[in-house]
């Protein structure tokens, strides 16, 4: 029996959402029980023996991964959401998109000063959303001790961007090209 890698579970959709884009669809990974379990195991592997107070996930697929990782670690989960999606008091950070600006938010009491946080998402492209998430966590006094992704798109520079912030970046696989 041959064993599939995480990359083998990810489908590529050509020309989505725009012509010339190769969309890396991780929903096929999530749909396969074995593939999903392998992904969670591998996301956690570099952090064996480390203690986290919280896991933060970026909207939306980071919620799926982050929830599973938090469950495995027996810790709390913090959703980092698009503006206007969280009830109650929040703090926000804006970041640049290719055409315009976006804003992410977190509850202002989601992370306590000094808590160690693992940031999780499905895909690292330019790193803008992850950087905004890191800034939110740090504004609350949390310490991001790792950033874990299923897919890295190295040609878009996200890893370099996060590493320039002093972040440890872990990705299960990389896809070259756009």
Curated annotation (Swiss-Prot):
SUPFAM superfamilies: PRTase-like. GO terms for molecular function: adenine binding; adenine phosphoribosyltransferase activity; AMP binding. Pathway: Purine metabolism; AMP biosynthesis via salvage pathway; AMP from adenine: step 1/1. It is an enzyme of class 2 (transferase). InterPro entries: Ade_phspho_trans, PRibTrfase_dom, PRTase-like, UPRTase/APRTase. Keywords: Cytoplasm, Glycosyltransferase, Purine salvage, Transferase. One of its GO terms (cellular component) is cytoplasm. It holds the Pfam family Pribosyltran. Transmembrane segments: none annotated. It is found in: Cytoplasm. PANTHER family: ADENINE PHOSPHORIBOSYLTRANSFERASE. Catalyzes a salvage reaction resulting in the formation of AMP, that is energically less costly than de novo synthesis. Belongs to the purine/pyrimidine phosphoribosyltransferase family. This is Adenine phosphoribosyltransferase. It comes from Cereibacter sphaeroides (strain ATCC 17023 / DSM 158 / JCM 6121 / CCUG 31486 / LMG 2827 / NBRC 12203 / NCIMB 8253 / ATH 2.4.1.) (Rhodobacter sphaeroides). The gene is apt.
């Amino acid at each position: 029996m041959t064993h599939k890698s995480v990359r083998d579970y990810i489908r590529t959709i050509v020309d989505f959402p725009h012509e010339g884009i190769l969309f890396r669809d991780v929903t096929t990974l999530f749909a396969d029980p074995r593939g999903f379990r392998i992904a969670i195991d591998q996301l956690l592997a570099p952090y064996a023996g480390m203690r986290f107070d919280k896991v933060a996930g970026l909207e939306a697929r980071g919620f799926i991964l982050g929830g599973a990782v938090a469950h495995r670690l027996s810790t709390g989960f913090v959703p980092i959401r698009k503006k206007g999606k969280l009830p109650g008091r929040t703090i926000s950070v804006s970041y640049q998109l290719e055409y315009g600006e976006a804003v992410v938010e977190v509850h202002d009491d989601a992370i306590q000063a000094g808590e160690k946080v693992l940031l999780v998402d499905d895909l690292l492209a330019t790193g803008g959303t992850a950087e905004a998430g890191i800034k939110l966590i740090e504004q609350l006094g949390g310490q991001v001790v790792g950033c874990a992704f299923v897919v890295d798109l190295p040609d878009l520079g996200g890893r370099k961007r996060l590493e320039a912030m002093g972040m440890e970046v872990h990705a299960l696989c990389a896809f070259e090209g756009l």
